[in-house]
């Protein structure tokens, strides 16, 4: 494939890649990806519908769960067009403005997910350590402020990245290593020094994932201290059980992120398919698994979903009769 390197940034393009060497199998590879995307969309929309339509679920925990579902939906939809475009139509070319826009949304939504998980850990801390004042501490106004601060912090920290990349001339190959645009991949293609991008990228990671993970760890240390002070064994288990879903969501988000970071920095000798696999796990597994985990582990959500399906089933039986 011949790549035309345009001197004008506005006319320049990047080329995305799927699974190199397996282009003939892209149609088959797209099947599990379609299933994952459909499951993510339906699962998170179901969570949002249940929370929005049931007044008994209008509490702090469920508001934060709704924020997580919105973030997961956004993260899924930000990669869907280019990933399926490559698998179905072999559409590899992407303009720099479109690439930078996708980059902005992917990194902003990833940062927002970290922030929402921190907000959920604060909710768990208040629920376990100060249960009598849960609704008075985390008021609707407070929850709205926490949500807005998550959006603003993420957007403002990520906003400089496209502008830092825009100043470069790209004299290396314009072929990106993934089916979507990421800051780390694009800056490697620049002709000049990328030290500023490296430093600012580390600063963003420290301010988002670094701070959030530290505060989440601290909140669970305080939760564990409170739980261990409870005399009743059953009450201790009940208190811990309320945190299981959130702990799973935290692990699903941070473990793939750490794994992807390690692979990028120290895994140059690894097969390229490992890099691709880790990147897809990082972006697709948390949005896929979060609604499933919360549907299974959260009794109120599980009961409402079952009722919805029973209602739909009864309607179908009614119309058949």
Curated annotation (Swiss-Prot):
Predominant place of localization: membrane
Disulfide bond entries: 99-191
Membrane protein topology class: Multi-pass membrane protein
Entry-listed glycosylation sites: 6
GO CC, alphabetical: plasma membrane
GO molecular function terms listed in the Swiss-Prot or TrEMBL record: G protein-coupled receptor activity; olfactory receptor activity
Alphabetical list of Gene3D superfamilies matching this protein: Rhodopsin 7-helix transmembrane proteins (1.20.1070.10)
Transmembrane spans: 28-48, 57-77, 102-122, 142-162, 199-219, 240-260, 276-296
CDD domains reported for this sequence: 7tmA_OR51-like (cd15222)
Chain ranges on the Extracellular side, renumbered to this chain: 1-27, 78-101, 163-198, 261-275
Domain of life: Eukaryota
Residue spans, topological domain Cytoplasmic: 49-56, 123-141, 220-239, 297-321
Keywords associated with the record: Cell membrane, Disulfide bond, G-protein coupled receptor, Glycoprotein, Membrane, Olfaction, Receptor, Sensory transduction, Transducer, Transmembrane, Transmembrane helix
Places the protein is found: Cell membrane
Family under the similarity heading: Belongs to the G-protein coupled receptor 1 family.
Protein task: Odorant receptor.
Name by which UniProt lists this protein: Olfactory receptor 51G1
Organism: Homo sapiens (Human)
Lineage summary: Eukaryota, Metazoa, Chordata, Craniata, Vertebrata
